[in-house]
Amino acid sequence: MMFRKKRVKVNSRVAHSQRSLKKGDVLTLELPQDKDYGVDVEKGSITVLYEDAHTLVVNKDPFMLVHPTGQTKSCTLSNYVAGYYAKKGVVHKVRPVHRLDRDTSGCILFGKTKEAQQYYTDELQAGRIDRIYTGLVEGCIDSDGVVDAPIGIDPVFDNRRVIDEFGQPAQTEYTVLCHDGDH
């Protein structure tokens, strides 16, 4: 497709797919530029933890959605990331690589390009990116352990996940950091 759209050049000249490269040739690929953010742009406070030309990592506060859904179209992290891009004067479609539940806070990884988003998605699916959570539980867990069970959609609350023999494989290692009364 890039050849058809004349986005591949060798030595500043449009190249054809059969063209062989020689030592010293300069290959230039013109990647398509985003024309919009993909979500409504909103001003909002975000904390950028890391950023480079391909990647944006932002802290998600609790009680916020990562992206707009059927009923919630505004005040999401993605809307605020679009506002952040707009304030910087750049246009990147907002591409979250993963999500966190509404009530959960933590790092959200965004790809600034379709290629970066796909790369990080592939890395997550291959298990080469770790997700580490800190949580507070009610009751007393005596020792560290592993929950190795498939996760599926809760039949009662479709926005929750439960252990489900037909769900996706999942493994959670946990470490008890401390005990405090009933927690």
Where are these regions (language model features)?
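RNA pseudouridine synthases
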Residues: 1-183
